[in-house]
């Protein structure tokens, strides 16, 4: 569904686009950053509520989410032929560490929240690095690789399509590495909330 979503639905309210529905609660900052990373990996329009992003905030939750949001917005204008105009393709397998994230789940027997609702804290495991692939009009394949955490991460991307040549770019489209004969797997080092675009031709 997420791949069809990229092609046919340009934007919806943030709570719905991340599967939260009307019973939205923020949960951990790490979970919000993971959702933002997935928004980028799926080629969706990044959206946040105004109170969630600020250039200056004393709230640690807001500072963390703001850092992720601003980092994840950078690739859109520089790789528009993939992220905005490309056709979604199956992403490669990514080997990386996992992280524990938490959110609130409605539960009448749970803890009473500030707004009066009752909920219990639920922990889920998710990858620290996510990826999505898009084919441009010229036939090249762009794979966006996203660090969903505030810590540096390493990941191994297993290429399903190797092509004749490949290049790895930073979010500002400066080149990091190039291969004349792409290997079957590529190791990527990502800074906090870092983004890379791997282009295979």
Question: What residue ranges belong to the model's regions?
Answer:
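Short, surface-exposed beta-strand/loop "edge" segments at domain boundaries and coil↔beta transitions
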Residues: 151-153, 175-177, 196
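Short, low-complexity, polar/charged sequence segments that are solvent-exposed and flexible
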Residues: 161-165, 186-189
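Solvent-exposed beta-strand/loop surfaces of large extracellular or lumenal domains
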Residues: 167-184
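C-terminal beta-strand-rich structural cap/linker in extracellular carbohydrate-active enzymes
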Residues: 181-201
């Amino acid at each position: 569904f997420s791949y069809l979503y990229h092609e046919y639905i340009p934007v919806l309210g943030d709570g719905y686009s991340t599967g939260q529905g009307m019973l939205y609660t923020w949960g951990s900052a790490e979970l919000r950053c993971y959702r933002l990373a997935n928004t980028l990996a799926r080629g969706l329009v990044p959206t946040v509520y105004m109170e969630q992003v600020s250039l200056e905030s004393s709230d640690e939750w807001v500072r963390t989410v703001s850092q992720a949001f601003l980092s994840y917005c950078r690739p859109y204008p520089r790789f528009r032929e993939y992220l905005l105009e490309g056709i979604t393709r199956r992403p490669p397998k990514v080997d990386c560490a996992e992280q524990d994230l938490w959110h609130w789940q409605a539960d009448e027997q749970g803890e009473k929240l500030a707004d009066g609702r009752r909920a219990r804290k639920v922990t889920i495991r998710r990858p620290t690095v996510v990826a999505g692939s898009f084919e441009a009009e010229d036939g090249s394949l762009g794979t966006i690789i996203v660090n969903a955490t505030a810590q540096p991460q390493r990941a191994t991307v297993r290429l399903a399509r190797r092509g004749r040549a490949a290049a790895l770019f930073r979010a500002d489209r400066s080149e990091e590495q190039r291969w004349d004969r792409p290997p079957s797997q590529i190791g990527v080092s990502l800074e906090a909330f870092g983004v890379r675009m791997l282009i295979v031709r």
